[in-house]
Amino acid sequence: MSELKDCPLQFHDFKSVDHIKLCPRYTAVLSRSEDDGIGIEELDTLQLELETLLSSASRRLRVLEAETQILTDWQDKKGDRRFLKLGKEHELGTPIKHSKPKKQKLDGKVSHASGPGPGRPKSRNMQQKMQEYEFTDDPVDVPRIPKNDAPNRFWASVEPYCADITNDEIKVLEDLLKTPEDEADYYKIPPLGKHYSQRWAQEDLLEEQKDGARAALSGDKKKGILGPLAELDSKDVDSLLKKSDSQHDQPEDGCPFGHLTQRLLQALVEENIISPVEDSPIPEISGKESGTDGASTSPRSQNKPFSAPHTKSLEVRVKEELIAQGLLESDDRPADDSEDEVLAELRKRQAELKALSAHNRAKKQELLRLAKEEMNRQELRQRVRMADNEVMDAFRKIMAARQKKRTPTKKEKDQAWKALKERESILKLLDG
């Protein structure tokens, strides 16, 4: 009985997992037939319930392994203690005549008490018990539970966001607030290039010029035919294109002036200045004059369109003058600009970029302000920790004085009060 009392085993009461209550899906799947199978939507629930069963089994396994190790260690210590006692008796050389009466006395007192005296029979009993508690190694290795490293990885990923703000991070924010040098380039509108029809025409002329130069080298006849075209250069091509544009770009009404110039002249001309046809006398034209006039005016000269120099510059000057006088708004653009889809889209995206950059700049300024405030709070928290250490030091000194049954000195009391007041003032600053 004494051996059972000294046994360090705890004999845990293992509670079995209630499958019906804790693992209802697992129980339902076991009760089905093989033909029913398992649905895809049930896999997540089954995984959780199987993990619950695995954790319960691993917990029981760990407890049993701990109990086995405790039992083995206890038997080893007990055997070593008894073998040491036997060795000491043999070294002392106890005579046999003294041991026999003791053995007889022990045999006579077996019914009354069983003392734990040293001897051969006890060692045999100990060996038998050791054989009883020997555990054979299971050939099947128990699978090791994988280490759950998810919390460590989670906190390692969160730590940079919860760490204290440093001066380097403040410097990074200040650098981000600086205006980049190339910011103005994003708001520039590139000049309008040549129209694709003009560019293609120029490319066609240049290509014909190259073809003519190649053909001129082949023979004199071809050189005589294509020579003038082959001698053209890029400047001649541009002049030809401008000439063709000036001939074909005449308005439908034949007037070379722009819309603003025409509207201005229409506003200045007085209406109803032509008298009726009946009242106006018809002048008589002599035959000589009519002959000369008839000879001078030909159908070809009548069909020739009217042209005036510097009409485009006149249109621009009229527009500038009307804007300066306040008769025309400066935002009014010509019809070509208003119909330019690329320019409209470019202006739209530039406006969005301005709004977005302004929003980002405001957020960065707010973030910089909050970071500087947090830096000040970090310094206050550091001072609070130092004040806490001072308060704890003063408290230890006072407690040590009371343990020695002496009253704390005035210096110790003043130091404690000073530390407490300083801590309160720092906390007020931190809360404020």
UniProtKB/Swiss-Prot annotation:
- One of its Pfam families is Ada3
Q: Which residues form a coiled coil?
A: 335-398
Its BP terms in the Gene Ontology are: regulation of transcription by RNA polymerase II
Q: Which domain of life is it from?
A: Eukaryota
Which residues lie in Polar residues bias regions? 293-305
Q: Where in the cell is it found?
A: Nucleus
- Specify where the region named Disordered lies, as residue ranges: 90-127, 275-314
GO: which molecular function terms? Answer: transcription coactivator activity
Q: Which UniProt keywords apply?
A: Coiled coil, Nucleus, Transcription, Transcription regulation
* Record-level GO cellular component terms: nucleus; SAGA complex
Family affiliation: Belongs to the NGG1 family.
**What job does the chain carry out?**
Functions as a component of the PCAF complex. The PCAF complex is capable of efficiently acetylating histones in a nucleosomal context.
- What is the name of the protein in this document? Transcriptional adapter 3-A
Which gene name does the record give?
tada3-a
